[in-house]
Amino acid sequence: MGQKTHPVGFRLGITHTHQSHWFAHQYSKILQEDHAIRQLLRDYVLKAGIARIHILRKSHQIELELHLARPGILVGRSGLGLDNLRTQLQTKWPHLTWRISLVEVSNPDANAVLLAQWLAQQLEKRIAFRRAIRQAMARAQKVGVKGIKIQVSGRLNGAEIARSEWVRHGQIPLQTLRAPINYAIANAYTTYGVIGVKVWINPKH
């Protein structure tokens, strides 16, 4: 029986790079620290649409590169939002110095992470899952992606029995290592329970 492999992990070093760069003896401690940093950032900049968090460590300095759909929301008036974020990080990890740089995502509708987050938000607003999927597919096709696949799993439309449904358009060559498949998962917390969202995107060249 064939097994599915993670599309991003499968392509590390070919079309994708690691999201953290550091070498350390205290591997498990720093890995947990990275996870906590990512969780804090995702909670803080939820409305800004965070697509990627890149962490680079140099001794006691951390360089954060945040890829955002709407960086202006995070920056806020006179950069107050960014200052507050830096203060929160410094308070929680006082032994580290922080450098934060923001990168605007040029094409949010062709980004699997942002599209999965958007779709999860629509499901939380009680929009019918088929309609939400159609809208997400239309947004991606409008910007000219080569292929897209969306799968939702759970108690869809409040059904008693959980199930999975998926829709695909265009080419999604999961076995082709040269294909830079963009993959993301998100959770929609509805009154009926959690609905899982998966998005695969094959961007245009």
Swiss-Prot record:
Principal localization reads plastid
**Organism from which the protein derives:** Cyanidioschyzon merolae (strain NIES-3377 / 10D)
Transmembrane parts of this sequence = none
Using the record's annotation, list all stretches that form the KH type-2 domain: 37-106
List the GO cellular component terms.
chloroplast; cytosolic small ribosomal subunit
According to the UniProt entry, its GO molecular function terms are: mRNA binding; rRNA binding; structural constituent of ribosome
Is Plastid set as a keyword in this record?
yes
Note the InterPro entries from the entry.
KH_dom-like_a/b (IPR015946), KH_dom_type_2 (IPR004044), KH_sf_prok-type (IPR009019), Ribosomal_S3_C_sf (IPR036419), Ribosomal_uS3_bac-typ (IPR005704), Ribosomal_uS3_C (IPR001351), Ribosomal_uS3_CS (IPR018280)
Q: What is this protein called?
A: Small ribosomal subunit protein uS3c
